[in-house]
């Protein structure tokens, strides 16, 4: 009985962690290879896709599938690059997830979680639903031991030469408690 419970707990923790829409649920491809991330992680990197936004489950899932296909087919990544992707519908989509190294920020992938917002946030503000989803994901990440309690949030632009996560999203996360201004 104890072994069955442990197996069930591990399955639930990995596949449905923090209310994330799993790859199976958004019809994602299986990664070609995985490398495990040392946890808990101290750094969270926020990005944007610079694509159109989405507000429905179907539209967001399609964009996530398109990103995964582009990353795997054109960039030769093992999987979608981001750890998580957040839609304007307020849902968080599984990318590399909490357990696997992503391919989102050169030089930082093995020591961070990359969270990407679907849309272009240079001129548009992210939806309140998407911001609430990020807060809930981060809170859950700490509770489940994926993130350190004193984790830091940075914008992609702070680490490489890019406008990501866009001016409006960057200005939003700069006001958050865990933001690291460097």
Swiss-Prot record:
Name of the featured protein: Peptidoglycan recognition protein
Triggers of expression: By bacterial challenge.
Biological process per Gene Ontology, one example term: innate immune response
Keyword Mitochondrion: no
UniProt subunit comment: Monomer.
Source superkingdom: Eukaryota
Biological role stated in the UniProt entry: Binds specifically to peptidoglycan and triggers the propenoloxidase cascade which is an important insect innate immune defense mechanism.
N-acetylmuramoyl-L-alanine amidase domain span: 39-166
Alphabetized UniProt keyword annotations: Disulfide bond, Immunity, Innate immunity, Signal
Species whose genome carries this gene: Trichoplusia ni (Cabbage looper)
InterPro entries: Amidase/PGRP_sf, Amidase_domain, Peptidoglycan_recognition, PGRP, PGRP_domain_met/bac
Family: Belongs to the N-acetylmuramoyl-L-alanine amidase 2 family.
Tissue: Strongly expressed in fat body with weak expression observed in hemocyte. No expression detected in gut.
Signal sequence, start to end: 1-16
Record field: transmembrane: none
SMART domains: Ami_2 (SM00644), PGRP (SM00701)
Cystine pairings recorded for this chain: 18-140, 54-60
Pfam families noted in UniProt: Amidase_2 (PF01510)
Record's keyword annotation contains Signal: yes
GO MF entry, a single one: N-acetylmuramoyl-L-alanine amidase activity
SUPFAM superfamilies from the UniProt entry: N-acetylmuramoyl-L-alanine amidase-like
CDD domains on file: PGRP
GN (gene name): PGRP
Gene3D superfamilies: Peptidoglycan recognition protein-like
């Amino acid at each position: 009985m104890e072994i069955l419970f442990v197996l069930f707990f591990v399955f639930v923790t990995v596949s449905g962690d923090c209310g994330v829409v799993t790859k199976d649920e958004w019809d994602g491809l299986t990664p070609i290879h995985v490398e495990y991330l040392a946890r808990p992680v101290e750094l969270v990197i926020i990005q944007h896709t610079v694509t159109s936004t989405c507000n429905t489950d179907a539209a967001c899932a399609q964009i996530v599938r398109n990103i995964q296909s582009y990353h795997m087919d054109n960039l030769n990544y093992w999987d979608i690059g981001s750890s998580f992707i957040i839609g304007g519908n307020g849902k968080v989509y599984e990318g590399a997830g909490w357990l696997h190294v992503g391919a989102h920020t050169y030089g930082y992938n093995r020591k961070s979680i990359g969270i990407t917002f679907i849309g272009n946030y240079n001129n548009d503000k992210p939806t309140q639903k998407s911001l609430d989803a990020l807060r809930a994901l981060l809170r859950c990440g700490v509770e489940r031991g994926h993130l350190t309690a004193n984790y830091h949030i940075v914008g992609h632009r702070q680490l490489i030469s890019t406008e990501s996560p866009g001016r409006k999203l960057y200005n939003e996360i700069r006001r958050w408690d865990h933001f690291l201004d460097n």
